[in-house]
């Protein structure tokens, strides 16, 4: 096995979309039953990927506007962002492109973003929608469309409660850092065209 590599993974997104629950579900295989606003301590875990040891540093951020000035301090040195929205909150879905992507591109240009749809277990929950008449479910197609719009390399829907696809979210984050998309070659070819002054 090779020496371990550190990857800093930062979660961002609106308040109450399930960022902290996603991290707790991944790191402890449990789901907190009460809403706990961002109390997840920064966490570090060794993960084996393709025979390589990865030291995965997980950073949680608060989505509420009160933290707009402090939150970007967490972005320094980030290797990848998990940008989360709730699959039962149209506002959080819309804020991905309105608020979060501009903020991330400003403070951390070039850092890849994995788009994450949370609360998958609630999307088909009739009781949830009966109790929340204003809630609008976000379809997989809408998530894929948003992924293309923001240029994210991956879009994953998950449920921290049932743990469905939770590991896949973090696997995708690690993979995009270890094997970045190969679109830089095209740019190099364009820049190789010379300029002649006669």
Curated annotation (Swiss-Prot):
Family matches, as InterPro entries: P-loop_NTPase (IPR027417), Small_GTP-bd (IPR005225), Small_GTPase (IPR001806), Small_GTPase_Rho (IPR003578)
Reported tissue expression: Ubiquitous. Preferentially expressed at the tip of root hairs.
Keyword annotations: Auxin signaling pathway, Cell membrane, Cytoplasm, GTP-binding, Lipoprotein, Membrane, Methylation, Nucleotide-binding, Palmitate, Prenylation
Motif Effector region per UniProt: ranges: 35-43
Family indicated by similarity: Belongs to the small GTPase superfamily. Rho family.
Membrane topology: Peripheral membrane protein
Function according to Swiss-Prot or TrEMBL: Inactive GDP-bound Rho GTPases reside in the cytosol, are found in a complex with Rho GDP-dissociation inhibitors (Rho GDIs), and are released from the GDI protein in order to translocate to membranes upon activation. Involved in cell polarity control during the actin-dependent tip growth of root hairs, thus regulating root hair length and root hair initiation. Contributes, in a SPK1-dependent manner, to the prevention of cortical microtubules organization into parallel arrays oriented perpendicular to the axis of cell elongation to limit anisotropic cell growth during petal development.
Transmembrane parts of this sequence: none
Propeptide positions: 196-198
Keyword Hydrolase: no
Covalent lipid sites (S-geranylgeranyl cysteine): 195
Coiled coil: none
A single GO cellular-component term on record: spindle
Annotated signal sequence range: none
Quaternary structure annotation from Swiss-Prot or TrEMBL: Interacts with Rho GDP-dissociation inhibitor 1 and ICR1. Binds to SPK1 when in the inactive GDP-bound form.
Lipidation (S-palmitoyl cysteine): 158
Binding site for GTP: 13-21, 31-38, 60-64, 118-121
Annotated source species: Arabidopsis thaliana
Name of the protein described by the UniProt record: Rac-like GTP-binding protein ARAC3
């Amino acid at each position: 096995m090779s020496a371990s590599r550190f990857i800093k993974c930062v979660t961002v997104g609106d308040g109450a979309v399930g960022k902290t629950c996603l991290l707790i579900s991944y790191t402890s295989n449990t789901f907190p039953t009460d809403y706990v606003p961002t109390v997840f301590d920064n966490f570090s875990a060794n993960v084996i990927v393709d025979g390589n040891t990865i030291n995965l540093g997980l950073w949680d951020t608060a989505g509420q506007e009160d933290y707009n000035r402090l939150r970007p301090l967490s972005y320094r040195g980030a290797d990848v962002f998990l940008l989360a929205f709730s699959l039962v909150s149209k506002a959080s879905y819309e804020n991905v492109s309105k608020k979060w992507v501009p903020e991330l591109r400003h403070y951390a240009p070039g850092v890849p973003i994995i788009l994450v749809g949370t609360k998958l277990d609630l999307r088909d929950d009739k009781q949830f929608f009966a109790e929340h008449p204003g809630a609008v479910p976000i379809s997989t197609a809408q998530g894929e469309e948003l992924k293309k719009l923001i240029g994210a390399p991956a879009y994953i829907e998950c449920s921290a409660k049932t743990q469905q696809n939770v590991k896949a979210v973090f696997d995708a984050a690690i993979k995009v850092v270890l094997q970045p998309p190969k679109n830089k070659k095209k740019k190099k070819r364009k820049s190789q065209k010379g300029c002649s002054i006669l």
